Design a protein with these regions (language model features):
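Elongated alpha-helical scaffolds
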Residues: 54-62
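Juxtamembrane transmembrane-helix boundary signature
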Residues: 60, 67-68
Length: 180
């Protein structure tokens, strides 16, 4: 994901992609998200106040590499001298202060921009845990089965169970499924 991060007084165009952890591991022999994630952002996603300065320098180096457009350019053009010239344009704590925003680019990839196509069906009563267990038992799912399925599986089973009540003009055969 490409984004602009404000570091000090300057906006820096940064590319946060799958190459970042690979490059980081190749150079520093450490896990990128473990090092950076545990050093800069706490469990609530807030900026930590105590930050390892080595991790800041390493992250700044990765950021510098990610300002270059392609992975080939990174391998061909990024040198220590180039990095020192680039990082000297910033104040000492600029990177530490921007780490939450920088890490936000990486964590933003987990978010979705998709919105649901259908509105949730209005029911007469709220969907409680007891109602969920009742519907699961009606569909033939035992309490011990709930340990093996995730919520998506259960909802799929419940949807298929409710579809069983419908009558269809034609039911697919094994031959139809094989052709599909």
């Amino acid at each position: 994901m490409r984004g602009t991060v404000k570091i000090g007084e300057r906006d820096v165009d940064m590319l946060a992609n799958a190459a970042s952890p690979f490059i980081y591991k190749k150079i520093f022999h450490k896990d990128f998200l473990m090092t950076v994630g545990t050093n800069y952002v706490d469990a609530d996603g807030k900026q930590k106040t105590d930050v390892d300065t080595n991790a800041i320098t390493e992250m700044a180096f990765v950021m510098h590499m990610q300002t270059v457009k392609t992975f080939k350019e990174i391998l061909d053009t990024v040198t220590v001298e180039d990095f020192v010239a680039w990082i000297s344009e910033f104040e000492p704590l600029d990177f530490a202060m921007a780490m939450a925003e920088i890490m936000g680019l990486y964590y933003q990839q987990q978010k979705t921009t998709v919105s649901p196509k259908k509105k949730a069906a209005q029911t007469e009563r709220p969907y409680t845990t007891a109602l969920f267990v009742l519907r699961s038992l009606e569909a033939g799912i035992s309490i011990s089965d709930l340990d093996f399925f995730d919520m998506g599986d259960i909802y799929d089973i419940l949807a298929e169970h409710s579809n069983d009540r419908e009558t269809y003009a034609r039911t697919a055969t094994q031959e139809d499924m094989d052709k599909f």
